[in-house]
C-alpha cells in the first residue's frame, strides 16, 4: 500500500511537471522576437542607443494598453491575440562586416522574426543583404543612401527620405533664398564621411547642384571616426564656397563644427543630411557653437507640437525616461518601423512572412510618429510618403525654415561669423 501511495505521489509530480512545462511552452510561444541592430559602440554610439530606445518605446505602446495614446495598436495589449514584442539588441560597431555577421546571428541563432536597423547605411547594406538571401524581413528607419532601395529587394523596407530627396530640397531652398532674399549663393562645397552613406550623399549633392547651376568648388571626403579634420576644413576654407552640404555622423559632426571655429571660417549657409546635426545630445555638447547650421529633419519638438501630438505622448511616456531627451529625426523613424511591422503582422493574422511582406508592399499604414501621418512603400521598399523639412538650430532649438508650408521661424542668413557670436 505504501508503495502504491508513493508511486501515485511520484506520478502526480511528473504530471504536474509536464503540465507546467506545457504551460511554459505555450507562454513562450506568445512572443515575437525582433532584432535591433545599431552602433552601440564607436563614434555613433549615442545615436545608435537612441534608435534602440525609440524601438523599445514603440514596443511598450504595442505590448501594453495605452488608451491615452491615439496610435495604431495602442488601445490593445499585444498583437495576434496577446503576442508580445521582445526586442533583441545587437551592436554592429559601425562596421559593415560586423553588421553582416550580427544579422546572421540574429536570424539564425536568436531566431528573430525581423530586424530593424542599422542607422549607418554602410551597415544596413550588408545586413539587409543577409535578410534578402534568407527571405527574412528587414525594416530600416533612417539609413538614407538612395542605393538601398534601388536593389530590387523584396524583404527590405525603409521609412526615411533618401539623400536624393534631401539634396533636391536643399537646392530648392537655395534657389528660394537666391530669388526672395537675393542671397547670391553660386558655389557649393561638399564634406562627407568616406562610407556608403557619405559617398552617396555626395553623389546626390553633385547631381542636384548640377541641375540647379550651382558650381561645386570643393569635394572633401574624410574617414569617419577621425580625430583631426583640420586639413579637410582648410580645403573648404581655401575654396570658400557660398554653401556647404555636410554628411557627418555623431562625433564627426561636432568635430567638423569645432574645427571650422578653430580656423575661423564659415560659409554663408550650411545644410546637413541626416547626421549629427539632428541629434539633441550632439547639439547640447556643441552649445552656441552649433547655432545657425541647418539640416533636413522629419521630427523636432516644435514640429511634433503642431503636426504630431501623439508622438509627444509616446515620447514623454516611454522614450524620454530612457534617453533623457526628446526624439530626434533618426531615432523616431526606427520606432515607426516597429509600428508598421506590427500593423502588418496584425493584418496578416499570423507570422506568415510572405503574407506579411505582401501587406507591407501593398497597403498604407497610419503613423502617429511620421510627419506625413502615413507610410506607403514603393517597389524596392522606399516610403512614398517620406517627408523632410529644413530646420535651423539656435539655442539648441530647431526652427523650421522650409518648405514654406511648415515654416515657423525666419532664418538667420548668412550664418553669424564666429567673431560676432
Where are these regions (language model features)?
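Extracytosolic ligand-binding ectodomains
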Residues: 2-17, 26-421
